[in-house]
């Protein structure tokens, strides 16, 4: 007789809302700064380390346990993006050479390319995530453009404050969409029905 098999049911919670809210709330707070509402301060950096960084990495590890390659890649990557961004801001205070505007432009454009690739993956997921990753791709390239033109090439005046504020508002939209998507998953699961629609994609 064949030996009986034991199936282990996955009863762990959905970690995606944690990752989305960690990303979204930190993005919103940083982009209030970019939009001109306050100076860059320890509140933004602390959020970048704790909620945008560590919490997203934890969410990514939980997604790895569930076998979700896309979410694992996204959350761990963006978690370490926030940690690296805080390091780029903080390390010069410890005597390390600061990244110049060109280096920051390349850094942000590279993240834009990565996010564009992840955006293609959202075509198999839902409309809400498509908006999050699509708007994030645009945000990274706007930020890269801002730093590139801050170099003030001959004949160019550099990026204006208005452009930075525009980029900040785009970032607020991006971060807000991630918050919406995270809360939608929490509320829809809690109530057992669609409270906030995510725009299901037919596969």
Residue ranges and their predicted role:
Residues 1-59, 63:
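N-terminal topogenic module of multi-pass integral membrane proteins
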Residues 33, 58-62, 84-96, 114-121:
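Membrane-helix exit/interface motif
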Residues 40-53, 98-110, 168-172:
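Structural signature of hydrophobic alpha-helical transmembrane segments
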Residues 57-84:
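Hydrophobic/aromatic-rich structural module bridging two neighboring secondary-structure elements via a short loop
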Residues 62-70, 120-131:
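Membrane-helix interface "capping/anchor" motifs
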Residues 72, 81-107:
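Helix-adjacent hinge/juxtasegments
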Residues 106-117, 127-153, 160-184:
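Alpha-helical membrane segments in multi-pass integral membrane proteins
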Residues 191-203:
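Short, highly charged, low-complexity non-transmembrane loops/tails of multi-pass membrane proteins
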């Amino acid at each position: 007789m064949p030996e009986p098999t034991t199936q282990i049911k996955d009863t762990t919670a959905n970690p995606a809302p944690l990752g989305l809210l960690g990303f979204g709330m930190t993005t919103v707070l940083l982009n209030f700064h970019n939009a001109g509402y306050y100076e860059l301060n320890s509140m933004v950096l602390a959020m970048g380390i704790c909620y945008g960084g560590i919490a997203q990495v934890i969410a990514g590890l939980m997604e790895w346990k569930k076998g979700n390659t896309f979410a694992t890649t996204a959350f761990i990557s963006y978690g370490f993006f926030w940690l690296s961004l805080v390091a780029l801001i903080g390390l010069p205070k410890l005597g390390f050479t600061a990244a110049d505007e060109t280096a920051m432009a390349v850094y942000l454009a590279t993240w834009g390319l990565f996010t564009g690739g992840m955006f293609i993956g959202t075509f198999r997921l839902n409309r809400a995530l498509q908006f999050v990753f699509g708007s994030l791709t645009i945000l990274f390239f706007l930020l890269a453009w801002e730093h590139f033109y801050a170099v003030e090439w001959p004949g160019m005046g550099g990026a204006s404050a208005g452009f930075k504020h525009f980029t900040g508002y785009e970032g607020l939209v991006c971060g807000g969409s991630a918050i919406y998507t995270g809360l939608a998953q929490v509320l829809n699961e809690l109530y057992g029905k669609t409270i906030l629609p995510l725009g299901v994609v037919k596969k």
